[in-house]
Amino acid sequence: MDVTKSLLCFISFVAFLLFSSVAEANKAHHHEFIIQATKVKRLCETHNSITVNGMFPGPMLVVNNGDTLVVKVINRARYNITIHWHGVRQMRTGWADGPEFVTQCPIRPGSSYTYRFTIQGQEGTLWWHAHSSWLRATVYGSLLVFPPAGSSYPFTKPHRNVPLLLGEWWDANPVDVLRESIRTGGAPNNSDAYTINGQPGDLYKCSSQDTTVVPINVGETILLRVINSALNQPLFFTVANHKLTVVGADASYLKPFTTNVIVLGPGQTTDVLITGDQPPNRYYMAARAYQSAQNAPFGNTTTTAILQYKSAPCCGVGGGSGTKKGNSFKPIMPILPAYNDTNTVTRFSQSFRSLRRAEVPTEIDENLFVTIGLGLNNCPKNFRSRRCQGPNGTRFTASMNNVSFALPSNYSLLQAHHHGIPGVFTTDFPAKPPVKFDYTGNNISRSLYQPDRGTKLYKLKYGSRVQIVLQDTGIVTPENHPIHLHGYDFYIIAEGFGNFNPKKDTAKFNLEDPPLRNTVGVPVNGWAVIRFIADNPGVWIMHCHLDAHISWGLAMAFLVENGNGVLQTIEQPPHDLPVC
């Protein structure tokens, strides 16, 4: 009996130590985000931009895998706002996901809301951004997830981590740009500059003194955590005369591969190692547009930062290329791909492989075929100017499977689902397009240009094994669409061009080591196939991360039912959840 008691005491003591060590290792990080108007000067002009804590870009958050984030958002701006934690799985914490009218009503001016969630099984680079209107043009920042304490990277530990946020800047109020586009039905005005960490760089007016500078020592290896936080533009990124070793993307590790250039759609992140193995000098880091939509206007300019060797015999500290007169100390410029270089994009995306054997579902319960396309609606007869500003006097729209997604306004979708409120949404999103046609052909019937509008969800049972074929279409114009799924990572098991053919294209499926992503670039005039297991209950939107497109309705949402027991059931809503 005494032996049994002693053994039980010993087991209890060990369990206590283990619990204490886990509790100590997994920390809770508390932050306060104050949403406010801040004077920001770019391109010679000053604007009252919406920021977090007066910072543009916003605060960098640093956590370890397993940590909890508690972020109180206080809205002192004049717009409604929400914050989305892009790529965070939000296991059972869908109330913290952030998309406006999907998982919550917006935080009104003068109000606050506290986001609380835990990072589970993710390491690498994520980010956060506003998910209301076009406020994410200036409301965004990095979220760096390190391995748990005592663990290490599956690659050589870098000397430093450097987040690089690629963005867009409007010499105007981005909210007004969107409102004008919605009013007229036309495409929104393009941005006036691309940025790296909020700065346009040397090639734009009034910008060279504040160009982002990244210092490096000879022989030093740093990890560049590159994030495309631009609203509407996939971007190429490169560094003059340096190789980039890709080791991760969307907070998942990859088999390392070396490249001269990377490409990121809006929403995507890529981790690359770079080594100071060149003669000490100044080298431009540069980003420019990848534009796949034919005849669509875009900003054909280049943003730059500077990789500056600390032993370079040149420069004043902290400035751009204007720190010395003449050209002798100008940074070396890299060669970037042409704006329409789809071949480079394809080679890059097809180089991705998961670091280890992937747990890809091989049996499928739900098989969806989802077409992606723009559209054109007729101008309303009572429109004030009598002529909308889309092509031939129409209004732009967009859809998935011929359904243009409409957000509710009185309740969020998750609130309506959780409380059983009728009339907010339906669960009849089609698993395939209503009409089969030559999706990437040149002679698509104009009858397919006007989609239905609705708030249609697709219901999934907990634990369902899901496959989605995402098919680009030539309606209006084919285009590379970065499709982002909230609440989940998914395996990209194949991609290709033309119309997906299940009889021959299934042979291309990679079920061994496909990359795990949260945002997939569906090839222009092509398709991508993704798979995941529906193990996270809630309402999760899937949308194009080109913000012009989501404002036109290029989205849908999944309703994932609760499973069995507490661990398969979404948590109860927080007490301070905003009301509409």
From Swiss-Prot:
GO molecular function terms listed in the Swiss-Prot or TrEMBL record: copper ion binding; hydroquinone:oxygen oxidoreductase activity
Any matching Pfam family: Cu-oxidase
Plastocyanin-like domain mapped to chain residues: 34-150, 160-312, 428-564
Residues listed as glycosylation sites in the UniProt record: N80, N189, N300, N340, N392, N402, N410, N443
Cofactor: Cu cation
Binding site for Cu cation 4: H481, C544, H549
Chief subcellular location: secreted
Binding, Cu cation 2: H86, H129, H545
Residue numbers binding Cu cation 3: H131, H486, H543
Tissues where this protein is expressed: Ubiquitous and constitutive.
Gene3D superfamilies in the record: Cupredoxins - blue copper proteins
Annotated positions binding Cu cation 1: H84, H484
Highest taxon of source: Eukaryota
Reactions performed catalytically: 4 hydroquinone + O2 = 4 benzosemiquinone + 2 H2O
UniProt KW keywords: Apoplast, Copper, Glycoprotein, Lignin degradation, Metal-binding, Oxidoreductase, Repeat, Secreted, Signal
Cofactor note: Binds 4 Cu cations per monomer.
Signal sequence coordinates: 1-25
EC identifiers of the protein: 1.10.3.2
Function: Lignin degradation and detoxification of lignin-derived products.
UniProt-listed NCBIfam families: laccase (TIGR03389)
Name of protein: Laccase-5
Encoding gene per record: LAC5
